[in-house]
Amino acid sequence: MYQRLKEINFRKPLELEWNSIFLILGFFVLAAILIAWTQRPDEELLLERLKDLDLPIVGVGPNINVSESLEIGTQTYPNSPYVVPADRVPIVILPNSAINIIKSLPEAKISFEKEVYARHLAHLLLKKDQKIFSEPILNSIKQDLTRNISKTLDTLWDEVDYAFEKNIGTLPDDDDGWKNVSVYGKVLNVVALLSGRVFVGAPLCRDEEWIKATIAYTIILGVTVGMLWKRPWWQRKILAPLYFRTLVGVHKKAEELLKPLLEREAALDPSEWEKKAGEQNDGQLIRWLLSHTPQKGGKIDVKQLAHDQLTVSLAAIHTTSITISHLLYDLATYPEHVAPLRTELESVIADHKTAGGNGKLSKVELTKLWKMDSFIKESQRLNPPILVQMRRYLTSPLALPSGHILPSGTFCGVDAQMTNRTVPYYEASPITHQQTPFDTFDGFRFSKLRSVPGNENRYQFVTSSTESLNFGHGTHACPGRFFASNEIKIAFAEVLLKWDVRLKPGEGRPANLYTDTNVMPNMKGEVQMRRRELI
């Protein structure tokens, strides 16, 4: 026994240390793998289950061309479901006849939240039971922002000139005054300023660190989730802390920047908010968010409020920047639209001034810009932000008109791309003979359709219907689309009034980028812009 103790006592300390380290590391690696295994996602098993339903599968992975698969699938199976084995999860593409069935089904049966949560791998980033979009932020957008859109317009008009001057006006000119503009990067900054003015107000919205934080969160989240999806399912839980490290740092910076503003606003009585809102309209979202967020022990949850601000900024910056980038590319590509767009805009502004206005168009005046609205809608029709809309996760079996019954656990959606390009309602129009082919850009396609008596309030950019799915449709149609529409129109008006836009000499429209079901404007593309000589 004594000899055995001596052997133990006199073993090399370093050897003991390394053995212990390897033992501990081995334990944690094994534990991580076991945890990952127990949380194994079912996307890899889903395709096998769907094969049992005898659904046609269109496309072969990896790196499947989803756009091409949708075109083939919807043309081949227009009235029945089929499967696109997209890079992230196989998606059952529902026929358009199913739209009215799924649009209002409750979360307990067909879940929008679970689909978004799964697609963004939110279980690897958020706390248990934490939602991507909290109830306070949803209430702030659905109730307050939508109801107070008119009040936000003056704020946006005030900010838009500064945003363009800062990001485009300072670029160097060539001998003829043309500037090379990296479209997506500059538009991101413009939209961050515009949205920030409403969401957090000045001066924070112009703080370079805040702008960097909101843009970085938008970009890094998408890139990080994409990287994790490329890893085998069992590695994601292990690698997530490393991959999300930069994003967590951005979140902490946002908390640091927001904390003084949140504490200052939270200390005010609600009656003081109303008085303040009457004096200035910027930063309203902060107050609305606080009004819907219960305090815990008399304290505000800065971390959750920062998450809410970053999430809504992400949604606003991402989709709006995509739309405006496409608008600049299309305006440069189809210059024949510029003169009619300017004439319409200048006419509405002149009428506004004649009526005693200051030229900053109100919500009512913006609705008079039929040609502008049509141009924006046509640009989005051919360049939708996402190819599959009304995406849902089935939490119970779903019976379809085709006779198929989809099992719970299925990811499904509707083909927005082909709906945009083949919808039959165009054919029913009395002016069908004037319409250009569906695969051709016609910026005034929808203003012509609206000119038909009875169509005046149809075919608008914000329209959500079975014929127009780019904002979704039904219970979960994008609640922020009305604010986004006005923000886009104000930015587009700034371009039309003060800038000429053209493609770089000898170049065509920068090609879109397709990743999984997403469509992005070319992030390296450039156009040329020059200040207009205003008389």
Swiss-Prot record:
Family named by the database record: Belongs to the cytochrome P450 family.
GO cellular component, one term: membrane
Highest taxon above the source species: Eukaryota
Record-given protein name: Cytochrome P450 monooxygenase BOA7
Localization per Swiss-Prot or TrEMBL: Membrane
Matching InterPro entries: Cyt_P450, Cyt_P450_CS, Cyt_P450_E_grp-IV, Cyt_P450_sf
Keywords: Glycoprotein, Heme, Iron, Membrane, Metal-binding, Monooxygenase, Oxidoreductase, Transmembrane, Transmembrane helix, Virulence
Membrane protein topology class: Single-pass membrane protein
Keyword Transport: no
Cofactor needs: heme
